[in-house]
Amino acid sequence: MKELQDRILKDGQVIGTNILKVNKFINHQVDPVLMEHIGEDFANHFADKGITKVVTIESSGIAPALMAAAKMNVPLVILKKQPSKTLHNDLYQTQVTSFTTEKSYELTLSRDVISEDDNILLIDDFMADGEAATGAIRLLRMAHATVAGIGILIEKSFQPGRRKINEQGYEVYSLARIKYMDEYQIDFIEEN
């Protein structure tokens, strides 16, 4: 998605060679027009998949996932990273380690929001090593739901996430695929 790539080049900041800071438009301050266009792109790409729910992990995936869910006219389910007093014992949980923070957390899904009849579009802001997506897929498998596709805003293609997810048999559709980045440049994989 050229619009997202252009915004990354304009407002993204590379830290080292592995971290891309997108605080100005995705995960601290959110550009609602960009999120609407991202939601439209995901909705169009996955239009023939019979999606019944969009799922994301809190918190940076919420804005684009909500826009996609709205365009598809389906509910959004948010996987929780923190225990909540409103979520009781009837839960699916799995441990996930964040690439960015290098901390582990218990990814949690209430059993009453996803069923075996659901056809899921999983959306997340980044894909690096694929750990978050793999954890979300584990939870959705526990619920016996079908993962119809995975939508990623920014993929670090020089890391193994896509390969890991593809090896599990899932389609990954990324809007901006970075093949190389350092503090001076960001190079994208150009899609046809």
From Swiss-Prot:
A GO biological process held by the record: purine ribonucleoside salvage
Recorded catalytic activity of this chain's protein: XMP + diphosphate = xanthine + 5-phospho-alpha-D-ribose 1-diphosphate
Sequence positions that bind xanthine: L20, N27, K156
Keywords linked to the UniProt accession: Cytoplasm, Glycosyltransferase, Purine salvage, Transferase
Signal peptide start-end: none
Matching Pfam families: Pribosyltran
Top-level taxon: Bacteria
GO molecular function, one term: xanthine phosphoribosyltransferase activity
GO cellular component: cytoplasm
UniProt-listed SUPFAM superfamilies: PRTase-like (SSF53271)
Subunit (UniProt): Homodimer.
Family stated for the protein in its record: Belongs to the purine/pyrimidine phosphoribosyltransferase family. Xpt subfamily.
Job description of the protein: Converts the preformed base xanthine, a product of nucleic acid breakdown, to xanthosine 5'-monophosphate (XMP), so it can be reused for RNA or DNA synthesis.
Protein name: Xanthine phosphoribosyltransferase
Source species taxonomy: Bacteria, Bacillati, Bacillota, Clostridia, Lachnospirales
